[in-house]
């Protein structure tokens, strides 16, 4: 599978958000990555659906919506209404992950799952064949500009092996 570049708009300057989206539109990026944080699952708040609607109007690339929130399943209809191609939820935020993945797929989006640096890749064994993509966090979620956590490279290798073994 060809790697897909999905630049995040988390650090965008909101005064120039349209310019940043236009830059992504003109790039080789495959998607626009949007991080949504609720201040509960992670200790920070990003932006909400009014900003996402604005981004969706401007973006020519598919939206990759990464929910760092509790109960992400409650927002499946809103994420779908934005026209998102991918809805990415955290393993750690979903006690019924398989159900959430099914709901995302039934809504017509590609389900993706994220794991935090401390979460073992083996936790994805039962769900790996049901998701389009896995995001391995290389920092603890909630803040930009953190130092890269070295052992996450090993997690990517473990994930590749899990995908190879399970098909």
Please report, for each region that a protein language model flagged, where it lies by residue.
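Conserved N-terminal beta1-alpha1 strand-loop-helix module at the mouth
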Residues: 1-88, 94-96, 103-106, 110-111, ...
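Short, hydrophobic beta-strand segments that form beta-sheet elements in well-ordered domains
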Residues: 113-115
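Short acidic loop-to-helix transition motifs that present clustered carboxylates
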Residues: 118-120
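Short glycine-rich anion-binding loops that position phosphate/pyrophosphate groups of nucleotides
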Residues: 139-141
């Amino acid at each position: 599978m060809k790697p897909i570049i999905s630049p995040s708009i988390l650090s965008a300057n909101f005064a120039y958000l349209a310019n940043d989206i236009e830059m992504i539109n003109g790039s080789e990026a495959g998607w626009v990555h949007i991080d949504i944080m609720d201040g509960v699952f992670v200790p920070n708040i990003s932006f909400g659906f009014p900003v996402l609607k604005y981004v969706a109007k401007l973006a020519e690339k598919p939206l990759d919506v990464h929910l760092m929130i509790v109960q992400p399943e409650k927002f499946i209809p809103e994420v779908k209404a934005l026209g998102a191609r991918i809805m990415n939820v955290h393993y750690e935020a979903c006690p019924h992950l398989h159900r959430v993945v099914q709901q995302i797929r039934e809504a017509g989006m590609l389900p993706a799952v994220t794991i935090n640096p401390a979460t073992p890749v083996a936790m994805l064994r039962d769900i790996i064949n049901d998701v389009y993509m896995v995001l391995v966090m290389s920092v603890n979620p909630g803040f930009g500009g953190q130092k890269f956590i070295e052992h996450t490279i090993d997690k990517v290798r473990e994930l590749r092996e899990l995908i190879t073994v399970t098909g």
